[in-house]
Amino acid sequence: MKIYTFILSACLLLVCSACHEASHYLLLGGSGWDKIAIVNKNTKEIEWEHPLEKGWECNSVAVTPDRNILFSYSKGAKLITRDHEEVWNISAPEGCEMQTARVLPNGNYLLAWCGYPATIMEVNAKGEILSKTDFDTHIEQPHAQFRQVNKNKQGNYLVPLFATSEIREISPSGQLLKSVKVDGNPFSVAALDNGNYLVACGDAHCFIELNFETGDIVRKVNENDIEGAQLFFVAQLLPKRDGGLYICNWQGHDGEAAKGHYPQLIEINGAGKMVWDLNDNATSG
């Protein structure tokens, strides 16, 4: 069974990671929610779930090549089997927050925690640390630093920083190579085939296509640009191979959002038309 991978929070904060378009299932989890769950995309019913402890903040989850499940939680990152067995657990230091856990194209895993210093690690399937990058975000509160770190084709790390509204490129040695300012509090960065990046701009209620080399915004999708949906906190963007896109649309900073049909997860096609959505506060918070 192939699985699309997403994240929800207790208020259905949605973020997403590696996917295969042939899938009819979604892997969902998230900050404040008491579980990670596999949901049938067609019926929107939970078909598998793994309990999470109260207070865990799960902002990344992924299906690994061998069908295990990788996820971050505030105190660390875990790899578990579908039978709920723990393969390994890597803890974040006291006072730090593990916010990133993703599968890299080479099959290894990328983990990152906020703190002093902030740290990015690459580990293998056994949980053995292959590399470690420490760097200073110059942001006082760890919780205001970042959520999802990514790696570019050049082998450097792209870090979207909440408090300073910027995307930083960090080398494996921890050197700051480049910084580009964006709107809002960026949550995630996703590469496109044309070399540009999609940036989820959080509370700016928008996402952009960014030429990172020049700093130019190629296009911007605003709060009311998608018919049938309204963007709130844009948490993560997942480009599809067919030109479509999944948009994770957290309602948490708007008390009125949950009262109407404002999809928490939106799928649009290459023309920007909404073709599927998920809006289920009753089940997921």
Regions found by a protein language model. Give the residues of each.
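Bacterial Sec-dependent signal peptides at the C-terminal "C-region" and cleavage site
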Residues: M1-Y4, L8-S23
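Secretory-pathway ectodomains
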Residues: A22-G285
